[in-house]
């Protein structure tokens, strides 16, 4: 069975971000991040979720991933918020049975 999906690829235009903080904010919202807090000689590790933790996907490359067609609206909406700072494209693809995990 063939499954419809979207390949999404993006490139960050670093000069358009006001600061490194804002650029990191983009990546954290998309991928999530690991937070480590050291307090009273104890180490607390938290995994903060990003958008891709909530959407099934296959990571193709550092800035490319495939999402099911019915889930792509969330991703497109996210990238539209960053359009002036991030160049992105989406392409319709068909996945064969081998990629049913998406």
For each predicted feature, which ranges?
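Short, intrinsically disordered low-complexity segments
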Residues: 32-83
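Short S/T/G/P-rich N-terminal loop/turn motif that feeds into the first structured element of a domain
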Residues: 1-24
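Conserved short beta-strand edge segments in small beta-sheet-based binding/regulatory domains
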Residues: 83-99
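Basic, often amphipathic N-terminal segments
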Residues: 22-30, 34
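Generic structural motif
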Residues: 13-15, 70-72, 93-98
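Glycine-rich loops and low-complexity Gly/Arg-rich segments
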Residues: 31-36, 89-93
């Amino acid at each position: 069975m063939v499954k419809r999906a979207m390949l999404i690829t993006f490139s960050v235009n670093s000069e358009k971000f006001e600061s490194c903080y804002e650029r990191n904010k983009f990546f954290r919202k998309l991928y999530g991040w690991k937070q480590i807090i050291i307090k009273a000689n104890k180490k607390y590790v938290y995994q903060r979720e990003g958008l891709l933790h909530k959407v099934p996907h296959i990571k193709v490359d550092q800035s490319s991933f495939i999402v099911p067609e019915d889930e792509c609206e969330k991703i497109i909406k996210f990238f539209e918020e960053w359009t002036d700072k991030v160049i992105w494209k989406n392409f319709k693809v068909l996945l064969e049975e081998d990629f049913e995990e998406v």
